[in-house]
Amino acid sequence: MKEHYQGLGHIAIYTKDMDESIAFYEKIGGALRQRASSPTPDGDKLLALVSFGGFTLELIQSPTPMPLTEGNVPHFAVYVDDLDAAAAAVRAAGVDTFMTPEKKVLPGLFGGLENWFFTGPSGEQIELLHML
């Protein structure tokens, strides 16, 4: 069965404000691929797909507010080739929600990595990840 898998399809997260979230993810390098809506008994659910090269983020805005808690997806990670340059680009785009003042360097974890977390407009945690 594994020969049929072609990679990660997308990661879905809830958002409080679709337009704000799309603008945020475009500002940090994502590209809006598609917008759609899906009817529900409570009204239309808004959907958007934002591409980041190797993966897609699906944004979902429910017509009835969803509790935005850590839940089953505490964060998502984006591989970067240069952590310092990627963090500088995010900051240059106006994002000032980094969760720590400095990156973490963890040489013994998963063969060695460095990372930096920041938050998106609905409180979602985003990890910039560079494998050493």
Model regions: which residues?
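N-terminal beta-strand motif that seeds the catalytic metal site of vicinal oxygen chelate
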Residues: 1-19, 73-76, 129-132
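Vicinal oxygen chelate
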Residues: 1-4, 35, 91-132
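Core segments of cupin and vicinal oxygen chelate
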Residues: 3-6, 13-56, 85
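Exposed loop/turn and edge beta-strand positions of beta-sandwich/beta-sheet ligand-binding modules
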Residues: 7, 44-46, 72, 112-113
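Short N-terminal helix-initiation segments at or just after the protein's N-terminus
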Residues: 15-25, 59-70, 91-95, 129
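Conserved short beta-strand elements that form part of the metal-binding/catalytic scaffold
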Residues: 33-70, 118-120, 125-130
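Long, charged/polar, surface-exposed segments that mediate recognition or autoinhibition
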Residues: 77, 86-91
